[in-house]
């Protein structure tokens, strides 16, 4: 019996947005961001799925000392229901002391599962070393594991990672530049000089000339009210302002592992002929000129007609209608049974030859 392996290359052609987008959907306010917190703690109450590492014992002994319990030096606690964990959380901007945070708890040692455990009081610190929140509570673990006497094991999802909804209480807030200075700055999520200029123009059209100025391809600086109480309504108005983002530059994105190829709308091909192994791909382009009657009130138009063929040693040929695009080239190569690596090699050769007008990105 013969088995045939079919390698499929997924080709996606994306059209870049031409409709208006709200500023809040394409940009962030500089300085208004979340902050990462991390801590080191103990999970107790595990049903024999804990660990016996030296640092687990050391952490457990330190906790006992903090409670005023001192064990003799020659006594080592036998613990199977304890695990050392890393605790982390994201602290949103403007969150105030007393509010809650969701936390994620991950095992650091040899614990088999955190299911059924409880995190003891853990300090969550920022990069500056200050404590911003305190976490504690029962874990919610979606995964599980089970071991058989014969050495067999079943693991579902990840039993060594859990979450505690509202498991941390904020003790200190983080200052932001929102209420200080004479300016507010918007940072585009995708840098583009044209989009930055369009954003500044839209803001100036609403507020008046010279109220906004693009600093570079990412940042647009806006003069803000000096009265802090007016900045919320001021920013609420601006972030709902519509801006038409500029079209992205021509790009071809290739994932060599999965065979996925994403072709940008503005990618262009010049006439070229490619031979790759036993496969031949040919691109031809013809120009047609439409000249209106001399007495007609018309304009001369120039159109391009392209034809692409792909052949293998078995003489298979594929013909395409005029107006060749890169996705048609990729489909033609895929139809003759080319592997994703062959498609990638052809795209790289087209780029080097100057026949592919666009940025080739390999991920």
Curated annotation (Swiss-Prot):
What GO cellular-component annotations does this UniProt entry give? bacterial-type flagellum basal body, distal rod, P ring; outer membrane-bounded periplasmic space
Indicate where this protein is primarily found: periplasm
Q: Tell me which positions the record assigns to the signal sequence.
A: 1-20
Record localization = Periplasm; Bacterial flagellum basal body
* Keyword Signal in annotation: yes
User: What's an example GO BP annotation here?
Assistant: bacterial-type flagellum-dependent cell motility
The alphabetized UniProt keywords are: Bacterial flagellum, Periplasm, Signal
Q: InterPro entries per the record? A: Flag_FlgI (IPR001782)
Which GO molecular function annotations are given, in alphabetical order? structural molecule activity
Signal as a keyword of this entry, yes or no, is yes
Similarity comment text for this entry: Belongs to the FlgI family.
> What's the subunit arrangement here?
The basal body constitutes a major portion of the flagellar organelle and consists of four rings (L,P,S, and M) mounted on a central rod.
Protein's name in the database: Flagellar P-ring protein
From which organism does this entry originate? Shewanella baltica (strain OS185)
């Amino acid at each position: 019996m013969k088995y045939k392996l079919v390698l499929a290359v997924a080709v996606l052609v994306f059209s870049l947005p031409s409709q208006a987008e709200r500023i809040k959907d394409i940009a962030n306010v500089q300085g208004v961001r979340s902050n990462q917190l991390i801590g080191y703690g103990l999970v107790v109450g595990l049903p024999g799925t804990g660990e016996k590492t030296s640092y687990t014992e050391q952490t457990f002994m330190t906790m006992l000392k903090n409670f005023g319990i001192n064990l003799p030096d020659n006594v080592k606690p036998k613990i199977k229901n304890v695990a050392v964990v890393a605790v982390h959380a994201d602290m949103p901007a403007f969150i105030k002391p007393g509010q809650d945070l969701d936390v994620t708890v991950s095992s650091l040692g040899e614990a088999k599962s955190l299911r059924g455990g409880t995190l003891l009081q853990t300090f969550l610190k920022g990069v500056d070393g200050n404590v911003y929140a305190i976490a504690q509570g029962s874990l919610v673990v979606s995964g599980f594991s089970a071991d058989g006497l014969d050495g067999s094991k079943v693991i579902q999802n990840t039993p060594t990672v859990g979450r505690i909804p509202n498991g941390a209480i904020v003790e200190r807030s983080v200052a932001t530049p929102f209420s200080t200075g004479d300016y507010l700055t918007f940072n585009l999520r995708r840098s583009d000089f044209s989009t930055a200029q369009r954003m500044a123009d839209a803001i100036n059209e609403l507020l008046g000339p010279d109220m906004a100025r693009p600093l570079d391809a990412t940042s647009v600086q806006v003069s803000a009210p000096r009265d802090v109480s007016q900045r919320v309504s001021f920013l609420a108005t601006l972030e709902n302002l519509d801006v038409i983002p500029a079209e992205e530059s021509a790009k071809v994105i290739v994932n060599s592992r999965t065979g996925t190829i994403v072709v940008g709308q503005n990618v262009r091909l010049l006439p070229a002929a490619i031979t790759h192994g036993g496969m031949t791909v040919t691109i031809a382009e013809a120009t047609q000129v439409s000249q209106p009657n001399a007495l007609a009130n018309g304009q001369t138009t120039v159109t391009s007609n392209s034809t692409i063929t792909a052949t293998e040693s078995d003489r298979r040929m594929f013909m395409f209608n005029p107006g060749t695009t890169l996705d048609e080239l990729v489909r033609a190569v895929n139809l003759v049974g080319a592997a994703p690596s062959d498609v990638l090699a052809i795209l790289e050769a087209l780029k080097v030859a100057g026949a592919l007008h666009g940025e080739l990105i390999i991920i």
